[in-house]
Each structure stands twice: as structure tokens, then as C-alpha cells.
Amino acid sequence: MRLNMLIYLIVACCWGKSLSIPQQILNEFKSTLLPLFGLKEQPKIEGKVQVPEALKKIYNIQNNFEYDTASLPLPGLYTKSANTIRSFTHVESPIDEKFVHPHRFRLKFNISSIPRHEKLTAAEIKLTRETAKNTSHPFQRVLVHDILQPGVKGLHGPITRVIDSKVVDSRKNTTVSIDVFPAVARWMQDPKTNHGILIVVYSIGAKKSPPEKHLRLRRDTAPPQWYQHQPLLFTYTDDGKNQQRTGTELTKMRPKRQSSRRHRKNLKDPCRRRQMYVDFGSVGWNDWIVAPLGYDAYYCGGECEYPIPDHMNTTNHAIVQSLVNSMKPKEVPGPCCVPTQLGQMSMLYLGSDGSVILKNYKEMVVVGCGCR
């Protein structure tokens, strides 16, 4: 973490909430942190954006995760290298009116906000459903078509390929997840090929159509209810900034506590981790950052005098430097109190395009300090 960023973080965070922060400090704070978060500018939010419960759940899981890792703790479909999740809603258009049947519908998602350099590791569409009652044929097949080429009126229908197929029980109301990785990967390579996804639902063993309101494919309710039931596209990407770490590196280190306790009284202000809270609301970011509203970043401060106790998590070079400093204080400076381990921070925020992003950022929290 760069020194100038720490300086402005400390200045901004130590400012009382009742006091106004000078505009110059605000500008420095924003210009330093936005690139750190992978953003070119502050998102501009228009209208109400509903945060999916699935992202809230993953955010809470990540914050309570046993290990300190920037990879998202997701099993199965999602690879461990993914450190960013984005959710997208269907882009409504006049084409929607052409799909009059409730069990055949085209979903279109604008994923242009995903940076081209990020690696796609998985993509899924989640569909909510209501329990169907009094049905003699409860099982349905959900066919997912990638639209390779849209149809031409009077000539031919759309050219598609099936990329996923699911059999679901209409007596259950659990969320249905369909894999759309091949389609989204192609869209990222060539945005012009994004013609959407065609979803068709059939009843298995029955001539009549499936229950009309089982799978929720299109808007048919008031906005508050639709926000909770609308289809959502989730993309899982890796921006390449988080290297895979070993189990030893992921576990939080505990300082050694040996016979060095007797040396503590010799240090007037020993090297240790100190409080530093970053308040996003103080710089006006609470309109696009959903969570956290702020976080404990901490910093390292204090003296590293000779002899350096074992619990200071030092190095052999620092021990030698402190020894020489004790003999020649004017010629050689003493070791510095610096972070020896940094942890990740999860952030849930809104994009200017209406998307919701959950991203993990490494090296944002001081976990341990030492003399180096």
C-alpha cells in the first residue's frame, strides 16, 4: 500500500464526522482508492437497484470465512480463482412482447461493464419458482439455448444451440441454476454476438403446458415483488491480482511468545498494530457502496529497539540492524515497524449500469506487525 494513500486515509479517517473534510483531501482520497478498487470513476447510481440475496449471503460467508483468502469460497461450479461476482438483470425491450407464451422467453443481459482483461471462470442464470399444486406431471425440462443468430422475419427463425438442460420438480420452490458459461465467454470475446439466451420449459409426460407461474421468466408482478423474483445472470471472474496462496499463508499467523516478555518494559511504545478506521460515508460513497459502510484497516506503529523481542516477528537482518543502531545511532537507523501480514476485504457495491458487484481485495487490512 503506497505511503501517500496511507497518509490521506489516516487524515480522512481521523476527521470527525461533524467536521467537513477539505475538498483537496477528498479528491486525493478518491483518486487513490478508486484505481485500487479497479474503478476509473465513481459509479453514478440512477434509480433503485435491488441487491440479490445470493450476493448478500456470499458476502456474509466471506466475512466469516475461516481463512484469509481473496478467492471466493464457492464450491462446485465456481473455481477458487474467482475473486469477483457480478449480477445482471434482463434488459427489457420491445422484442419481449413477441414472446407471448409464458414458457418460452428470451433473456438479454448487458455485460459490457466486465473489463476485458478479467478471466471468466463461470456464469449462471438463476431462476426463481413457485410451488405448483395439484399437478399429475410435476417434472419439467428446462432447455437453455444460446442464440447464435437472431431470426429474420419471413425467412427463418433464430439459429441456436443448446448449452444446458435441467429437469426440475414443480412441487419445489428452490432456485434453479442454469449454466451459461459458453454463451457469456463468447459475448466477452465479441460483444456483437450477444443476442441473448432463449429458455424453453416443457412438461415431461404431459401434453398440456407446465404450470404458468412455476418458473419466473418475465415480468408479471408489481416492481417490489418482481425485484425479488426476476431472472439474474451471475458472472464469476478473476482480475489476476490475487495469486493462489498456500494453506500456511492463508492461516493467520500468531506472534511467538517466549522469554522475550521481560523486554517489553524496556520499550516506551513498542511496535504493534493500531486502530485506523476507514469510513466510506465520510467521503460520500455510501450511495454506491452497499457493504461495508467502513472497515478497520489498522496500521503499524511504535519503536523497534534492541534487543528486539521474539514476538515482534522480526528478521535476522532487522536484528543485526537494531544491534548496529544501538552502537551507532547517528549512522544507522533502527528497523521500522511495518505490516508483516495483510488480509483481504470484501466489498459489495453498485455499478453505473445497474449491476451489483461483490469483489475481494487483497492486502487491505493489517493482520500483524513486526520490526523489519
UniProtKB/Swiss-Prot annotation:
InterPro entries found in the cross-reference section: Cystine-knot_cytokine (IPR029034), TGF-b_C (IPR001839), TGF-b_propeptide (IPR001111), TGF-beta-rel (IPR015615), TGFb_CS (IPR017948)
Entry's localization field: Secreted
Range of residues in the leader sequence: 1-20
Disordered, as annotated region: 237-267
GO process terms (BP): cell differentiation
GO cellular component: extracellular region
Stored SMART domains: TGFB (SM00204)
Pfam family, one: TGFb_propeptide
Glycosylation sites noted in the Swiss-Prot or TrEMBL record: N110, N134, N173, N313
Disulfide-bonded cysteines: C271-C337, C300-C369, C304-C371
Ranges of compositional bias, category Basic residues: 253-266
Subunit structure: Homodimer or heterodimer; disulfide-linked.
Record's function text: Acts as an extracellular morphogen to establish at least two cellular response thresholds within the dorsal half of the drosophila embryo. Required for the proper development of the embryonic dorsal hypoderm, for viability of larvae and for cell viability of the epithelial cells in the imaginal disks. Acts together with scw.
Family: Belongs to the TGF-beta family.
Protein name: Protein decapentaplegic
Annotated organism of origin: Tribolium castaneum
